[in-house]
Amino acid sequence: MKNSTSIAIGGFDGMHIGHQHLFSALGERGTIVAIETGYANLTPKRERENFTHYPIMYIELEAIRHLSGEEFIAFLKEKFPKLQKIVVGYDFQFGKNRKHAVEDLKTLFDGEVKVIDKVTFEGESVHSNKIRTKLQLGDIKGANAYLGHNYTIKGEHISGQGIGTTELVATINLQTDGFLVPKEGVYVTLTRIDDEEHYHPSVSFIGHRVTTDGSFAVETHVLDGEVICKERASISFVRFIRDNKKFETLSELKEAIKKDIAVASKELQFLQL
């Protein structure tokens, strides 16, 4: 990273299509500078690295929020001695109390400043907050369009209720700390098990088990045969099927799950996984 001549600065949670426009302006010797605010839940921790070939430097906001505009530029030059170009979004702000905007950056930095205009999809500007809202509303297709990829959560394999295999269908239960989970309900998904390179067609449930014990669950049922999950799995969301619903009996729930499986199977039948 010390040899980088260009950097893109931002939060970059989600690594959505707007972010990718910034990265396309970096050139060959570029680095992404991700400012960690503590709010990243679309691509938490180091998940952003899965959506770019550029190296990423993570900087905690608390470490720089007290810096003046001049001090911030000096900080960047210390981190990147060969810095020639800074790429930012049109709404970028920096310095103590977010005092400075892109015009100040052009004044304070003696190299090139590339400002990327807002990126839109179907007339709407793309922002991470809008993606979060879409996920919370169950608008998976809308969120994925803004992201430029399927929204994906990851987690450690945990024990479930134990009634899936015997009374309903076998599921893999996950503890997905750090990720924003979509609206409660049932989804067409793709599931990746442990270190496998491919995804399995699946149907997944997010929410409280209102028909049984009321506990919250993130669980996925793989459609192409029985699989064994040893440690972890990823769930990639394709589309919303239905809301979470309380059924009077387990047999009613099982019938609903059969219908969910049929919907997911039809949706995913033409995908090359």
Predicted region positions:
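A structural signal for isolated positions on well-ordered beta-strands in alpha/beta enzyme cores
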Residues: 31, 85-87, 114, 221, ...
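Glycine-rich loop at the start of a catalytic domain that most often binds anionic cofactors/ligands
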Residues: 42-50, 71
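Acidic-and-aromatic substrate-binding clefts and catalytic sites of carbohydrate-active enzymes
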Residues: 39-41, 64-67
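Classical nucleotidyltransferase
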Residues: 67-171, 194, 248, 252
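Phosphate/ribose-recognition catalytic cores of enzymes acting on nucleotide-derived substrates
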Residues: 160-273
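Short glycine/proline-enriched coil/turn segments at helix->beta-strand junctions
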Residues: 2-5, 25-30, 52-56, 81-82, ...
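N-terminal catalytic cores of NTP/NDP-binding nucleotidyl/phosphoryl-transfer enzymes
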Residues: 1-45
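A conserved beta-strand->alpha-helix junction
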Residues: 55-64, 117
